[in-house]
């Protein structure tokens, strides 16, 4: 992994980039942010989920990142008011690396759906908690494009709770896929969403 010291040098070398002005300013800011997440020791200390995050050698050069950005950023969606975020997880196999092969610009609502359904809890299963007051398992799910979690019921055993959560999760995934199709994302991205499974901390 590239050291924090080298990261500091990279920042100094790119401050006078000709791409900082105009449209390229967005590109430069996103590049700086990904370097911070992948290489910044202070950032990783504050956000432990980025502890194992890294960046490919090519993207240490702003020109290389900009070349990829210009080919892959969906300006057409931005003009429609769709907020886009750089995602490194959907196309990877858990490697947590920023690279041309693992990154894609997704609508923020899609990115949020993926993230919310990966946060774990005491049961080991996302969206399932044991309610001590009722001695039952309570199920909630993050609905697509909604801020609050949907209540799905109370269950005597965790197997039933998991089954209900999986059913609801698949319903939400279908909504995400339909949305991406409307935005004309390619089939490979849609297929990746379709292949997402319920997060289990033991897996």
Predicted regions and their residues:
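Extended, polar beta-sheet/loop recognition surfaces of beta-rich domains
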Residues: 110, 118, 172-203
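A short, exposed loop/beta-hairpin motif centered on an aromatic-Gly-Thr core
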Residues: 51-56, 147-159
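Short, cationic Gly/His-enriched loop motifs
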Residues: 21-24, 32, 37-39, 46-141
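C-terminal accessory/regulatory regions appended to core domains
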Residues: 136, 159-169, 194-203
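An aromatic-rich alpha-helical recognition segment common to small helix-rich domains
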Residues: 65, 128, 139, 155, ...
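Extended, surface-exposed interaction regions
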Residues: 1-26, 30, 36-39
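Active-site proximal helix-loop segment of RNase H-like, two-metal nucleases, encompassing DDE(D)
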Residues: 42, 138-147, 153
């Amino acid at each position: 992994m590239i050291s924090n010291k080298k990261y500091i040098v990279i920042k100094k070398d790119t401050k006078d980039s000709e791409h900082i002005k105009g449209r390229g300013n967005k590109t430069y800011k996103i590049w700086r942010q990904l370097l911070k997440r992948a290489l910044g020791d202070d950032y990783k200390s504050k956000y432990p989920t980025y502890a194992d995050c890294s960046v490919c050698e090519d993207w240490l050069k702003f020109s290389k990142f900009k070349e990829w950005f210009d080919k892959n950023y969906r300006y057409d969606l931005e003009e429609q008011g769709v907020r886009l975020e750089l995602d490194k997880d959907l196309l990877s196999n858990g490697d947590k690396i920023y690279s041309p092969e693992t990154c894609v610009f997704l609508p923020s609502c899609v990115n949020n759906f993926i993230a919310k359904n990966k946060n774990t809890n005491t049961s080991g299963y996302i969206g399932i908690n044991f309610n001590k007051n009722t001695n039952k398992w309570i199920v909630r799910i993050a609905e697509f494009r909604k801020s609050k979690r949907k209540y799905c019921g109370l269950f005597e055993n965790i197997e039933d709770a998991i089954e209900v959560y999986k059913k609801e999760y698949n319903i939400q995934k279908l909504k995400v896929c339909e949305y991406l199709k409307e935005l004309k994302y390619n089939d490979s991205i849609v297929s990746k969403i379709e292949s997402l499974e319920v997060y289990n901390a033991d897996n």
